[in-house]
Amino acid sequence: MKPISLACGSLRYGITCHFLWYLPKWQDAEQFGYPLGVQTQISAEYSADPRVTEIEAILRKCVHCGMCLATCPTYQLLGDELDSPRGRIYQIKQVVEGHAPTVDTLRHLDRCLTCRNCETTCPSGVQYGHLIDNGRALVEERVSRGLFFRIKRGLLLTLLPHRSRIQPLVRLGQAVRGVMPQVIARSIPTAVDPGPWPEPQHGNRMLVLDGCVQPALTPMTNAAAARVLDACGVSLVSVQRAGCCGAVKFHLNQQDDALDQMRQNIDAWWPEIEKGAMGVLATASGCGVMLKDYGHALASDPVYADKAKRLSEMTMDTVEAVRSALDNLDENRLATVRSSAAAAGPIAFHPPCTLQHGQRLAGVTEGLLRRLGYTLTKVENSNLCCGSAGTYSIFQPEISGRLQSNKVAALESGNPSIIATANIGCQLHIGQGVAQSSDVPVVHWIELIDRALAGEAAGGEAGR
C-alpha cells in the first residue's frame, strides 16, 4: 500500500505531506520502507555540533502531517506557515543543511511562543521545544541582532534573573504607583502582605524555588503554598542560596549562563536533598518546566548530570504536591475548604502552557479544584497561550496583545467571580488585560485553597 501524498502549497519548501492513517503508529512507517521523518544532509560545518546532532534526531520524528498547524497560536493569528511549527522546522532544517539564515529566518523563529501546544498535538512525539531552542541559538550566531533588541535584552538579563535587583525597583514602582499613568500603573501589582510562613515542624520536608521576580511581584503565592502544605503535613523550606531557575537566560539565548544558574541551584539544594527532602516545589509552572528539564540540559556535564537528573525527577508543580498530600488534611479542615469553595462563586481557570503542554498536566489542577468543591466555568480554547510566554510580551507586543485580548475574552465569557492560573507570568499578563475592562481578581489557584483553609471567601487584591 502506497501513502497518499498531498502537496503543501502554502509552505515555500516544496514539501510533500504523507498521511499514514493506515498505520497503527507513525513509527511503523519504516517497516513499510517509508523513510520516517524529515531527512537531512547536515552541513560539514555542523558535523561536530552536539546541538545539531539533537536537531537531526528530533527532525527525524516529524512526518510533515501538519496537525500542529491547527493548534499553533501564531499560525492562527498570522496565517503564514513560516510562523507555524512545521514552517519553523523546515527553516531550521535549511540552516543545518548549510543554507545561510537571514533576518527573516530569525524573525519567524522569534515569533514562536515556545508554548509547546504543538508537542501536545503531535502524534510523532516531536520535541519541538528543544528543537526551537537549538535552532534559535544556531541562527543567532549567524544573524546580527539590531541595537534596540540588544539593549532591551541586556536590560532584561541584568534585572530579571536577579531578585536582589528587581525587588528594589518593584518597591519603588509600588510607592509611586498612584501618580503614574494608568497604562504603566496597571503593570505594577499592589503591594500585599504575604502572611506568615509556618515554621518547619513536619518530618516530610519539601524545598521550594523562590524564583527571581515572584518574591517581589507575587510574594503571597509561595507563602500560601507553605500554609496549605503545612496543613497537609508537609513543611516547605526555602533555601536562600538558590536563585533564578535559568529560564530567562536560557530562552534569551544565554544558555551557558543559564547552565551556570542551574548548577548553582543544584549546589544550593543538594545538602537538603541528601538530608531527605522529598521534592522540589515550583509554584510557577514556567519555572517548574525548566527545573524538570535540568536533566536534559546538563546531560553532558560529567559532574552534574546525575544530580540534575535526580533533581528533575524530584521537581513537582503545586498541583502535584498538593494532590499527593491532600489525604493528610484533617477532615474538619477539608470541610471548611469545601464550604468556602461552595460559596466562592464561579472560577475561570487558565492552564498555563508550561503546565498543560510543558509538564503534561492538562486538566489536573481543574480536577483538584472541582474535587474540593469549586465551580469552574467553561473556557473556550483553553489550550491556547495567553501571550505572556516569559519575555515574549516584551519583544513581540503586538502578537502578545492579540493573544491577551482573546484569552481575557474567553476567561470572562463565563462571568467568573475570580480568575485563577498557575504561573506568575500568565497571572500578571492576564491581570493587566482584565484590568482594562473589569475588577475581577486574577490569582494563583493555591491562594484560593489558602483562603478557604482560613475560612475566607475567594477574591481580594492578590491578583493586582
Question: Which residues fall in each region the model found?
Answer:
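Short hydrophobic transmembrane-like helices used for membrane targeting/insertion
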Residues: 1-4, 15
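Non-heme iron-sulfur electron-transfer modules
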Residues: 35-47, 51, 75-107, 125-154, ...
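Iron-sulfur cluster-binding electron-transfer modules in prokaryotic oxidoreductases
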Residues: 128-464
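Cysteine-centered iron-sulfur cluster-binding motifs in ferredoxin-type domains/subunits
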Residues: 56-75, 102, 106-126, 354, ...
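Acidic, Ala/Val/Gly-enriched low-complexity intrinsically disordered segments
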Residues: 7, 28-30
